[in-house]
Amino acid sequence: VLGTLENLCELDDKAKEILSGLKKPVSVCFDVKHGPSATIKFTKSGCRMEDGVRDCDIYIPLSSCEKFNGVIDGTVTPVPLKGLTKIGFLLKTFTALTDRLSEVMQPSEEALKDRAFFELSTKLTFYTISVALSQIGNQDKIGQASASYMLDGDIAFCIKDGPAATIRVKDHHLVTIKEYPKKP
């Protein structure tokens, strides 16, 4: 879900407004034991997530995928091992962005009546699903079994006249690229 922050910051005026107050770039790394890790770099103009532990301002290790899911659900409070001086970013900017992401990803029926909001919610849900497909193929035992049968190449995953993504398969490892493939 956190990878969808990229798209939120790109597509949503409220998220852009939240980031506009950022004085300098801040990067946050989530490192899940026996699970995925990613580093998200935030700037005034948006954010970018990269797989893996990268150079970061804030480092948050998590002991399991369940703990990470708890962080996402708000039932687990993460404890940074690095970046305590940047706690203000986590408590204000990061929390405001994730709250906005939750608002868009778990919309009320009333909010969905607004066509622009409906389209934003649909796009963000699509991008969340596209990234989840790769994560499942790489991290889940059944997903890994399925990926073991996949040939190298690009898979087009899209909504007609809407958002598109490429699921790139290389040596049974899946990567999501948030654009339509050149040669599906």
Where are these regions (language model features)?
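Long, compositionally biased, glycine/small-hydrophobic-enriched stretches that function as flexible linkers
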Residues: 27-29, 52-55, 60, 66-79, ...
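Low-complexity, glycine/alanine/valine/leucine- and proline-rich hydrophobic stretches
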Residues: 37-73, 158, 162-184
